[in-house]
């Protein structure tokens, strides 16, 4: 059972309570703190669209602490981040691995950050399928196309040559925050909020 903290605010009309995620949303903060799957993707996409409708000119802040997950769910978030008008600033806290790292890198250029003790991991897409040989072949071809697409996007977002990306994602590739900055996955390592 997951417990969600409640925040109580004083207003001129009295007290109002929010779950913590709703309160963060009021400040244009979205928190992705679990595996990327269809449910979490739907929630993140809905929040992105809501915040765009609220104010299309104000940045949105996506905090990421995720081990990764579904490629199709992650691509729904990625495409929405690129589609909406506001810049989406991404901030890694803890770990951004696999699709989590991909979404971290998908933030607006100049607005992709990690806290100093964060870890970022990139690798090639994982897939598993069983069944008839013909169906296995179909799925193998699909995952190779997805791998090419993800590599191409990572190359574009990091500035790394495609051949470097292909080599570097062959196995789990863990980076500390400063290494991720040098690689181009993020733009800066931050230690405190700007005052």
From Swiss-Prot:
One of its GO terms (biological process) is protein quality control for misfolded or incompletely synthesized proteins. Its EC number is 3.4.21.92. PANTHER family: ATP-DEPENDENT CLP PROTEASE PROTEOLYTIC SUBUNIT. Keywords: Cytoplasm, Hydrolase, Protease, Serine protease. GO terms for cellular component: cytoplasm; endopeptidase Clp complex. Pfam families: CLP_protease (PF00574). Cleaves peptides in various proteins in a process that requires ATP hydrolysis. Has a chymotrypsin-like activity. Plays a major role in the degradation of misfolded proteins. It comes from Clostridium novyi (strain NT). It catalyses: Hydrolysis of proteins to small peptides in the presence of ATP and magnesium. alpha-casein is the usual test substrate. In the absence of ATP, only oligopeptides shorter than five residues are hydrolyzed (such as succinyl-Leu-Tyr-|-NHMec, and Leu-Tyr-Leu-|-Tyr-Trp, in which cleavage of the -Tyr-|-Leu- and -Tyr-|-Trp bonds also occurs). This is ATP-dependent Clp protease proteolytic subunit. The active site is at 98 (nucleophile), 123. The lineage of its organism: Bacteria, Bacillati, Bacillota, Clostridia, Eubacteriales. GO terms for molecular function: ATP-dependent peptidase activity; ATPase binding; serine-type endopeptidase activity.
């Amino acid at each position: 059972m997951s417990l969600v903290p409640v925040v109580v605010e004083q207003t001129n009309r009295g007290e109002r309570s929010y779950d913590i995620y709703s309160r963060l949303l009021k400040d244009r903060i979205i928190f992705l703190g679990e595996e990327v799957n269809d449910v979490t993707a739907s929630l993140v996409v809905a929040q992105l669209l809501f915040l765009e409708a609220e104010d299309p000119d104000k940045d949105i802040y996506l905090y990421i602490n995720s081990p990764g997950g579904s490629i199709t769910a992650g691509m729904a978030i990625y495409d929405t981040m690129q589609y909406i008008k506001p810049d989406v600033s991404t901030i890694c806290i803890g770990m951004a691995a696999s699709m989590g790292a991909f979404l971290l890198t998908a933030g607006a250029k100049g607005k992709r950050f990690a806290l100093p003790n964060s870890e970022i991991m990139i690798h090639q897409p994982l897939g598993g399928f069983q069944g008839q040989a013909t169906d296995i072949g179909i799925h193998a071809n699909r995952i190779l196309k997805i791998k090419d697409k993800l590599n191409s996007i990572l190359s574009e977002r990091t500035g790394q040559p495609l051949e470097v990306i292909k080599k570097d994602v062959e196995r789990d590739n863990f980076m500390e925050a400063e290494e991720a900055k040098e690689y181009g996955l993020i733009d800066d390592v931050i230690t405190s909020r700007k005052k």
